[in-house]
Amino acid sequence: MKYFDLDGKKSYFNISKYVIGWRPALMVRVCDNVVDDGYFISVNLLDNAEKPIIPEDCIAFDVNNVGPEVYARLRQLGFFEEVDTVNSGFCFYPVCKLNLKKIKEYAV
């Protein structure tokens, strides 16, 4: 497994799937000397029938809880590209096509 630099800290991904819709659930893990802290960078957006509104090879980036500098850095590193935006409630989420081959190199 490889690591990438995020704000001066060694970081990697955890990849899983959301139970409803089976879309990628992407978590960034940040290494430190005690414990690896992590946070999800994706959100599972569903329509009224609980069907995913994001394409299978994409995520809705969680701009409510993840800073713009993280979004910019991960995009700069080529882990995804923004292909659209989607509205949910009061928020517009970037829809990002994942470079899963590259992400898996940096994932456990």
Residue ranges and their predicted role:
Residues M1-V19:
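Short, charged/polar N-terminal "headpieces" of proteins
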Residues K9, Y18, C31-N33, L46-N48, ...:
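Generic structural motif
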Residues F13-F40:
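Catalytic phosphate/metal-binding cores of nucleic-acid and nucleotide-processing enzymes, i.e., regions
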Residues A25, I53-E56, V95:
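Generic low-complexity segments that are intrinsically disordered, proline-rich and/or Lys/Arg-biased
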Residues V30-G78:
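Acidic, aromatic-enriched beta-alpha/helix-loop junctions
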Residues V63-V108:
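Short, compact, well-ordered microdomains
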